């Protein structure tokens, strides 16, 4: 058996987007048990969209370990969100969870209001929620899918940032999750890749506009990461070999990505924006 034929994960598929972490085998690694915090975000408040599972969950836990109170949003994965809330609270930090459609501008405004109302302030905004729907041909991407993908992946960032800005003071951070597909492209994720490219341009442009206000804007572009979106997007056979085609020959785990967000959220990245 060649390396390309070896299974990276047990074959599995979920019919519901954005997927449920509780149904995955194996569960993604999010808790970063070996991570040693040093109070880099002490007293801060972070709002993380899509924070119930995957990268967002790992970021929420890492931020909490560094001293931040956390607000997370999710779609309808109540079990995952409750688990994340408990893990954050185990660090001694506060956590609120908010269910809704991030593609709805009204919800974007509401989550900012609730974060400030319940946690007292907002220092770090992580725009992380996203969705993807593979299609083999561009002709198979419906108008509904196209609009939905853009609403969730990029329009939501505009709406959430606009709502957050009145509360973000000098030194605040905005961190957007893009993807390696923004640079490499993807033949079966054309609409998704287009939104991720838009996020790169959005991040660079917004960083220039907010520089005078001393608000830092950056993005993280992960490669293949083992999150619920994977079994919810691809066939069982595709999932079995997910991540095997990259140089490290495996997918990343969420808690291997989270330290990038910690770096961008704290003073260590004081000379980085855009």
Regions of interest found by a model, annotated:
Residues 179:
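Residue(s) in the substrate-gating loop at a strand-loop-helix junction
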Residues 161, 195, 203:
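Active-site helix of classical SDR
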Residues 61, 113, 117, 152-172, ...:
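Amphipathic alpha-helical dimer-interface segment in Rossmann-like NAD(P)H-dependent oxidoreductases
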Residues 139-158, 175, 199, 248:
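Catalytic Tyr-X3-Lys loop
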Residues 188, 212, 223-246:
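A glycine/serine/threonine-rich, flexible loop-to-helix segment
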Residues 104, 109, 132-147, 166, ...:
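Conserved mid-core segment of classical short-chain dehydrogenase/reductases
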Residues 1-30, 212, 219, 241-272:
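C-terminal helical subdomain
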Residues 78, 99-113, 143, 255-256:
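The beta1-alpha1 cofactor-binding region of Rossmann-like NAD(H)/NADP(H)-dependent oxidoreductases
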């Amino acid at each position: 058996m060649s390396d390309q034929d070896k299974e990276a994960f047990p074959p599995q598929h979920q019919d519901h987007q954005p997927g449920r972490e509780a149904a995955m085998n194996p569960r993604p690694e999010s808790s970063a048990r070996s991570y040693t915090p040093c109070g880099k975000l002490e007293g801060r408040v972070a709002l993380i969209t899509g924070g119930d599972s995957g990268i967002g969950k790992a970021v929420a836990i890492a931020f909490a370990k560094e001293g931040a109170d956390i607000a997370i949003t999710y779609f309808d994965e109540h079990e995952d969100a409750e688990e994340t809330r408990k893990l954050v609270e185990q660090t001694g930090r506060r956590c609120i969870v908010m269910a809704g459609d991030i593609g709805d501008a009204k919800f974007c405004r509401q989550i900012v209001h609730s974060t400030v109302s319940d946690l007292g302030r907002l220092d770090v905004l992580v725009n992380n929620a996203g969705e993807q729907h593979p299609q083999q041909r561009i002709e198979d991407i419906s108008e509904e899918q196209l609009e939905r993908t853009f609403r969730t992946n990029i329009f939501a960032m505009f709406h959430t940032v606009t709502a957050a800005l009145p509360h973000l003071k000098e030194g605040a951070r905005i961190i957007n999750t893009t993807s390696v597909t923004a640079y490499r492209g993807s033949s079966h994720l054309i609409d998704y890749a287009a939104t991720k490219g838009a996020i790169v341009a959005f991040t660079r442009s917004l960083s220039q506009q907010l520089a005078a206000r001393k608000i830092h804007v950056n993005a993280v572009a992960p490669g293949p990461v083992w999150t619920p979106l994977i079994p919810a997007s691809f066939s069982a056979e595709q999932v079995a070999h997910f991540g095997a085609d990259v140089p490290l020959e495996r997918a990343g785990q969420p808690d291997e990505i989270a330290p990038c967000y910690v770096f961008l959220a704290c003073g260590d990245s004081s000379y980085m924006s855009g």
